[in-house]
């Protein structure tokens, strides 16, 4: 008999129904559950797949460079970044009539094109690329790296080159290499690129392979480094009248601590960025030599964990047993990695707009909005994934004997307290925030807006003042003009910071009021509720009050009727599933808040946000409805415009989102009935009945239907908001 899909599970391959296909797809990447899997093969498969992942990433970035070089207008954009619209790629569509061709021919192009809202133009410009040839060179290099990665993945699956399990479990060596190699050396290399290529380019000097060995990045070369006069590298920075990309007003400094923004580009000083990366490189190069390997120097992580006795014995046996628990569980390690990466991705979203690193990106409002929203959604999915794998760790890898009375076991012992406190915080935030919003709504509806409950966020304003924002009138720390911190700040460190924080043209420490106070607490409600669901799902993964014996049921068992006491919605997967809705909900509020506040800031009418954001009707009417007018107007009696594609996507996003409910609000019997009816009709229809299938069609399982529903809900939700965000922002600001 020929091998049927899935080859990794012979039991599933013999299933006579369509379940074979769906379960096969669902478990294709769950290597642990495959036939004949060994620990060694498991680690080797995952290791090899990392090379494939890298190959895809390099291929994708290569494609970005290639398409912009081929179909974009990079060289024209470089001449005038503020007024030329950057082109992502051409559009070839045989359906386009003349009005469509005219609507999408922009940015000086000869035919229809897409505008780039990804910020790649600003990024490439900042790091010193100037010509299409530079872009092609980068694309070819990344294509080469992609090929090398694929070869590496293939190579490490060959018997001679397969690493052993002991190699994968050598935590100290891996940590040393990742800290000093991945972070240290790459940061040092990036500092080198900034100093040798990007900073000269920002001063009008074109450094390439043919001349980089004879162009000194600093007039005194390496002299100051070897004589210990490092401060010379910070002297004579670019002046405030510097024109980026030219020598006009430029200096010679390469490593500075200026603070604030370049007045023309509104982005961080390149010399500050280089300094930052050099500092990071040194820190991580040192950190990468801290752990004991073959050389007998440095710390053993296991010794560190075992030696730590918590004060007063309040944490039981502390960290004993944790080293082996973590080192033998790839789910625990993945959970930690995803949690860290999720937080970092959200921080990227926050810092890309408040401290823009790329020249002129702060003046490209649509790109700013798109990048913020993109990174927040990515962060949400990564963070929920961290808890999913935390739950799988408890089910598959957690050994109570190994972890007796240590911090992990004690988390499980008092999980009721953790869950109930989170529940209490969520309820408090939800009822109070909604109560304030609804009260204010009613006051507006009754024509007495002066009776709203408006709370000034005085603690947050005090924190902003401590960082140097003077408009609130708090006389504290950096906003206290006669304090030592203020005086030191003028000269020693970051002299440009105080100018930047008090300038109202950027997004640093935006002025906040009662509307911000309310939406902040709405977001806090979303964060706490999402966390509650995720934490409960992970801590109850092995067993809960209703069902103490979940271990053998696995991660995603379905509803199993009243026979076993009713198992509906109590698998770890069900918690993850519910949490994703709350995560999307929360990020919706976050992005609504960010976008509305910035639209009013960019348009110069901040009072609209301040006055309308204190009640729900204000959000619905003055943010959502008012800004969707561009989308509703994509097609009208006068033909079409360049927003019509977003208008279509807005509708299509709603359709995908609504389709999700078809899967979410249904039951298995209905699906089976529907499929039987369709199969019956197919078999009795001439011509159609020539096509037969061997697998008997069966309904999706409850878990599968929920997954399909969740996928449609998520994709539709994000599609809809993406279209709204890009159309409403680009429609206003071009």
Swiss-Prot record:
Annotated membrane topology: Multi-pass membrane protein
Entry GO CC: chloroplast thylakoid membrane; photosystem I
UniProt xrefs under Gene3D superfamilies: Photosystem I PsaA/PsaB (1.20.1130.10)
Binding site for chlorophyll a B1: 654
Molecular-function GO terms, alphabetical: 4 iron, 4 sulfur cluster binding; chlorophyll binding; electron transfer activity; magnesium ion binding; oxidoreductase activity
Cofactor note: P700 is a chlorophyll a/chlorophyll a' dimer, A0 is one or more chlorophyll a, A1 is one or both phylloquinones and FX is a shared 4Fe-4S iron-sulfur center.
EC number of this enzyme: 1.97.1.12
The entry's keywords: 4Fe-4S, Chlorophyll, Chloroplast, Chromophore, Electron transport, Iron, Iron-sulfur, Magnesium, Membrane, Metal-binding, Oxidoreductase, Photosynthesis, Photosystem I, Plastid, Thylakoid, Transmembrane, Transmembrane helix, Transport
Residue sites binding [4Fe-4S] cluster per the record: 559, 568
Catalytic activity, reaction form: reduced [plastocyanin] + hnu + oxidized [2Fe-2S]-[ferredoxin] = oxidized [plastocyanin] + reduced [2Fe-2S]-[ferredoxin]
Gene Ontology biological-process annotations: photosynthesis
Compartments in which it is found: Plastid, Chloroplast thylakoid membrane
Transmembrane segments: 46-69, 135-158, 175-199, 273-291, 330-353, 369-395, 417-439, 517-535, 575-596, 643-665, 707-727
Residues binding chlorophyll a B3: 662, 670
First-listed, main subcellular location of the protein, grouped into a coarse class: plastid
Residues reported in the UniProt entry to bind phylloquinone: 671
Job description of the protein: PsaA and PsaB bind P700, the primary electron donor of photosystem I (PSI), as well as the electron acceptors A0, A1 and FX. PSI is a plastocyanin-ferredoxin oxidoreductase, converting photonic excitation into a charge separation, which transfers an electron from the donor P700 chlorophyll pair to the spectroscopically characterized acceptors A0, A1, FX, FA and FB in turn. Oxidized P700 is reduced on the lumenal side of the thylakoid membrane by plastocyanin.
PANTHER family: OUTER MEMBRANE PROTEIN, OMPA-RELATED (PTHR30128), PHOTOSYSTEM I P700 CHLOROPHYLL A APOPROTEIN A1-RELATED (PTHR30128:SF19)
Subunit (UniProt): The PsaA/B heterodimer binds the P700 chlorophyll special pair and subsequent electron acceptors. PSI consists of a core antenna complex that captures photons, and an electron transfer chain that converts photonic excitation into a charge separation. The eukaryotic PSI reaction center is composed of at least 11 subunits.
Family, similarity comment: Belongs to the PsaA/PsaB family.
NCBIfam families, sorted: psaB
Protein name: Photosystem I P700 chlorophyll a apoprotein A2
Gene encoding the protein: psaB
